[in-house]
A protein has these predicted regions:
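Surface-exposed, polar/charged interaction patches used for macromolecular assembly or partner binding
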Residues: 2-5, 18-315
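Bacterial N-terminal signal peptides
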Residues: 7-15
Length: 315
């Protein structure tokens, strides 16, 4: 009798737990740790904020630039904290901080998804963040500055720009990640470029997206990155897997994927467009311009790709 009562109580508790889970999950879903995995969101550091790079609609003035350093000409790269460098140009303020950036070009000159070049032309010019420096001497024709924060080696000719403090991104608690969330109708765009011209992207990496403050985007907003299977179908590499056989010798009627005369089979036809889009990760906005956003990948279920879609994710 005691055993029966114990089993009944256990059944009631289990039923209650499932009911509670169903109430907290979106309509049309049963939440499990597979389709709603827990996401541990990374918090951006000071280096993440100030070393992310950016894409700017217009070119930055280049009248102020790095001319050399204490050990010129024997040293042509400057990166150590506290290292002294010389700044050419006018209007430097003693004790003021400045930002050292580099106007970039892609040495590969190859589109990684259709339309990338056209999107980038609309977005503007990519820049790398190299360092934050402070002017310590203005008695000569060139100002002397020391490096306070180094992101990457500085070279002669790199641009010196005004510095602005950035607000830290608040810690984000862990939450459930909806892998198959449909479009929410919020502002959306694409990952067009990544820092260092990377193409396979994961947690901690920086990306540049083609929407900004003109679309209401602000620092601290979160984007959900997603990919459709149609994108894989049109990718020169990923599409090879769609073309490979999925059949097994014991399968009487194997299916066709996007059936045509060459791939016709006696089984059902699978239309790639009917497969659900899948969410691949979360991106937090570190910086915005009117037409672009710089983001950091703070959670990734799989590699993100250039060309992946992004959609504003109300947290």
């Amino acid at each position: 009798m005691k055993k029966t009562g114990l089993l009944l109580a256990l059944c009631l508790l289990t039923t209650g737990a499932f009911a509670q889970a169903d109430q907290s999950s979106p309509a049309g879903t049963v939440a499990t740790n597979v389709n709603f995995p827990a996401e541990a969101i990374a918090t951006p550091t000071q280096s993440d904020l100030y070393c992310a790079g950016f894409v700017n609609k217009s070119l930055l003035p280049n009248a102020t630039y790095v001319a050399g350093g204490l050990d010129t000409p024997n040293t042509t790269q400057f990166s150590d904290g506290g290292e002294l460098i010389y700044l050419a140009g006018k209007s430097y303020t003693l004790g003021q901080r400045y930002r050292v950036v580099r106007e970039l070009k892609d040495p590969n000159r190859r589109e990684l998804f259709n339309g990338q070049d056209a999107m980038l032309k609309v977005m503007g010019q990519p820049y790398a963040d190299l360092a934050i420096v402070r002017v310590v001497d203005t008695r000569s024709r060139m100002a002397v500055a020391h490096i306070e924060l180094s992101c990457a080696p500085i070279l002669p000719g790199d641009i010196v720009a005004d510095f602005a403090e950035k607000s830290p991104i608040a810690f984000h608690p862990s939450m459930k990640f909806d892998r198959f969330a449909p479009s929410n109708g919020k502002a959306g765009g694409r990952i067009v470029l990544a820092k260092d011209f990377d193409s396979e992207l994961g947690t901690g990496m920086k990306v540049y997206m083609n929407l900004g403050s003109n679309q209401g985007i602000k620092v601290g907003d979160y984007f959900r990155a997603f990919r459709s299977y149609e994108a894989d179908l049109h990718n020169p590499v990923d599409s090879l897997s769609f073309k490979a056989s999925t059949a097994e010798d014991t399968q009487a009627k194997p299916p066709s994927i996007e059936k045509n005369m060459l791939t016709k089979s006696s089984g059902p036809t699978i239309h790639v467009a009917d497969l659900p889009r899948r969410a691949v990760g979360e991106i937090v906005v570190l910086d915005v311009t009117p037409t672009t956003s710089t983001g950091m990948i703070v959670f990734a279920m799989e590699d993100m790709h250039l060309g992946d879609g992004v959609e504003l994710d109300p947290q």
